[in-house]
């Protein structure tokens, strides 16, 4: 499983999503992730909207195996249900 987190500096939800990804990477052999700083990479909200296919209001925007999952709360719910994040 590969997760991509699109975030920006100073965003507490981005930090939290990245921390969850670090936890999962440490707990699971089948998990890895990449954090993409949208400011450093020059990615705009419009770029994300094209990829996701709907308006983007907030970051982080998170993909699991190239499928858009949503933001930090959506990622937490998915990881809790499917990956044992809070076990």
Curated annotation (Swiss-Prot):
UniProt GO BP: cell redox homeostasis; cellular response to oxidative stress
CDD domains: GRX_family
GO cellular component: cytoplasm
Recorded GO MF terms: electron transfer activity; glutathione disulfide oxidoreductase activity; protein-disulfide reductase activity
Listed Gene3D superfamilies: Glutaredoxin
Record keyword Cytoplasm present: yes
Keywords, ordered alphabetically: Cytoplasm, Disulfide bond, Electron transport, Redox-active center, Transport
Keyword Transferase: no
Disulfide bridge map: 11-14
Major localization class: cytoplasm
Localization of this protein: Cytoplasm
Start and end residues of each Glutaredoxin domain: 1-87
Assembly with partners or alone: Monomer.
Similarity comment: family membership: Belongs to the glutaredoxin family.
PANTHER family, sorted: GLUTAREDOXIN 1, GLUTAREDOXIN 2
Biological role stated in the UniProt entry: Has a glutathione-disulfide oxidoreductase activity in the presence of NADPH and glutathione reductase. Reduces low molecular weight disulfides and proteins.
Protein name as it appears in the record: Glutaredoxin
Provenance organism: Vibrio cholerae serotype O1 (strain ATCC 39315 / El Tor Inaba N16961)
Gene name for this UniProt entry: grx
């Amino acid at each position: 499983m590969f997760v991509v987190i699109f975030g920006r500096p100073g965003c507490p939800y981005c930090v939290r999503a990245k921390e969850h990804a670090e936890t999962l990477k440490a707990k699971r052999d089948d998990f890895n992730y990449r954090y993409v700083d949208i400011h450093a990479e020059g990615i705009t909200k419009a770029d994300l909207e094209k990829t996701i296919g709907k308006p983007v209001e907030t970051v982080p925007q998170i993909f699991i195996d190239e499928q858009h999952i949503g933001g930090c709360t959506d990622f937490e719910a998915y990881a809790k249900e499917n990956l044992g994040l809070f076990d």
